[in-house]
Amino acid sequence: VPTQRLCGSHLVDALYFVCGERGFFYSPKPIRELEPLLGIVEQCCHNTCSLANLEGYCN
């Protein structure tokens, strides 16, 4: 799965594409309580993320 760096309006556009009518939020849902949570900017702009990562921010 290709990953890419998404920042600013590119990140918002990608979220609209992936989440559609479900909408999205900027803090991830914790998968495990001990896992440190990265915000979407840290995950997808400072680093790279995939469409699957983005889907974790959909409502």
UniProtKB/Swiss-Prot annotation:
Pfam families for the chain: Insulin
Q: Where is the signal peptide?
A: none
- Judging by the UniProt lineage, the source's domain of life is Eukaryota
SMART domains hit by this protein: IlGF
Which keywords does UniProt give here?
Carbohydrate metabolism, Disulfide bond, Glucose metabolism, Hormone, Secreted
Where it sits in the cell: the answer is: Secreted
Transmembrane ranges, per UniProt, are none
Q: Which GO terms describe its molecular function?
A: hormone activity
What InterPro entries does the annotation carry? Insulin, Insulin-like, Insulin-like_sf, Insulin_CS, Insulin_family
Q: Which GO terms describe its biological process?
A: glucose metabolic process
Q: Any one cellular component term from GO for this entry? A: extracellular space
Task: Describe the family membership recorded for this protein in Swiss-Prot or TrEMBL.
Answer: Belongs to the insulin family.
Describe, as the record does, how this protein assembles with itself and its partners. Heterodimer of a B chain and an A chain linked by two disulfide bonds.
Q: What else is known?
A: Due to a substitution of the Arg in position 31 by an Ile, this insulin B chain is longer than most other B chains and is processed differently.
Q: What does this protein do?
A: Insulin decreases blood glucose concentration. It increases cell permeability to monosaccharides, amino acids and fatty acids. It accelerates glycolysis, the pentose phosphate cycle, and glycogen synthesis in liver.
- Its recorded name reads Insulin
Give the organism, scientific name.
Chimaera monstrosa (Rabbit fish)
